[in-house]
């Protein structure tokens, strides 16, 4: 069984743990840097990206997270997690982890009162997935090797680049675990390749 960590500094941690377990993997809440060595994949949950960055800096997680990304182990960023994974952020000079060759705009759909749900078609996952958008970012631009998995209107809301997956929405806030299951499969495949 693969072991998937959920970065436990802030955000919808408990919901991600439940979704990972429902998808047949072991879930671990990561609160210490050394735990990164024990896991096969990592979820960066939604939350408030500036608060999350402050906590990442406070607990000296940034370099270990970048090292984890370079190791080739899969990472999945949802909402604020997408912002953490992006190489370029509109209106900000420096990236956070910067593992995905994507450009992201923060709070692109508006503030909290503009939160909404939308039925999405997601490549590799299926139709009618309810995306919960809360002060959501979206992807403005992608490199050639980034696969766009889902659009909402004209906006890219789910993308994949090799071992990295990012979504504007919160897949963990519904009882539909298909997006998490897709990530669990990514982690299983990556682990199999390491064994071979």
From Swiss-Prot:
Entry's transmembrane regions: none
UniProt pathway annotation: Cofactor biosynthesis; pyridoxal 5'-phosphate biosynthesis
CDD domains in UniProt: GATase1_PB
Top-rank taxon: Bacteria
Active-site feature positions: 79 (nucleophile), 170 (charge relay system), 172 (charge relay system)
Binding positions (L-glutamine): 47-49, 106, 134-135
Pfam families assigned: SNO
GO molecular function, one term: glutaminase activity
Assigned keywords, A-Z: Glutamine amidotransferase, Hydrolase, Lyase, Pyridoxal phosphate
E.C. numbers: 4.3.3.6, 3.5.1.2
Any single biological process term in GO: pyridoxal phosphate biosynthetic process
Gene Ontology cellular component list: cytosol; glutaminase complex
Catalyses which reaction(s): aldehydo-D-ribose 5-phosphate + D-glyceraldehyde 3-phosphate + L-glutamine = pyridoxal 5'-phosphate + L-glutamate + phosphate + 3 H2O + H(+); L-glutamine + H2O = L-glutamate + NH4(+)
InterPro entries xref list: Class_I_gatase-like (IPR029062), PdxT/SNO (IPR002161), PdxT/SNO_CS (IPR021196)
Record's keyword annotation contains Lyase: yes
Family affiliation: Belongs to the glutaminase PdxT/SNO family.
Function: Catalyzes the hydrolysis of glutamine to glutamate and ammonia as part of the biosynthesis of pyridoxal 5'-phosphate. The resulting ammonia molecule is channeled to the active site of PdxS.
Assembly, per entry: In the presence of PdxS, forms a dodecamer of heterodimers. Only shows activity in the heterodimer.
Protein name: Pyridoxal 5'-phosphate synthase subunit PdxT
């Amino acid at each position: 069984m693969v072991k998937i960590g959920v970065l436990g500094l802030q955000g919808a941690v408990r919901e991600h743990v439940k979704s990972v377990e429902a998808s047949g993997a072991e879930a671990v809440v990561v609160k210490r840097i050394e735990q990164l060595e024990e896991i096969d994949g990592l979820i960066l949950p939604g939350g408030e990206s500036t608060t999350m960055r402050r906590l990442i800096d406070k607990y000296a997680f940034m370099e270990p997270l970048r090292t984890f990304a370079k190791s080739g182990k899969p990472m999945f960023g949802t909402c604020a997690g997408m912002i953490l994974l992006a190489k370029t952020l509109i209106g900000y000079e420096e990236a956070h982890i910067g593992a995905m060759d994507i450009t992201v705009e923060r709070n692109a759909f508006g503030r909290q009162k503009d939160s909404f749900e939308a039925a999405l078609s997601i490549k590799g996952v299926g139709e009618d997935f309810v995306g919960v958008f809360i002060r959501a970012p979206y992807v403005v631009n992608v490199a050639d090797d980034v696969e766009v998995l889902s659009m909402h209107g004209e906006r890219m809301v789910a993308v994949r680049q090799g071992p990295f997956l990012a979504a504007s929405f919160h897949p963990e806030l519904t009882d539909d675990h298909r997006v998490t299951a897709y990530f669990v499969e990514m982690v299983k495949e990556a682990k199999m390749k390491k064994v071979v």
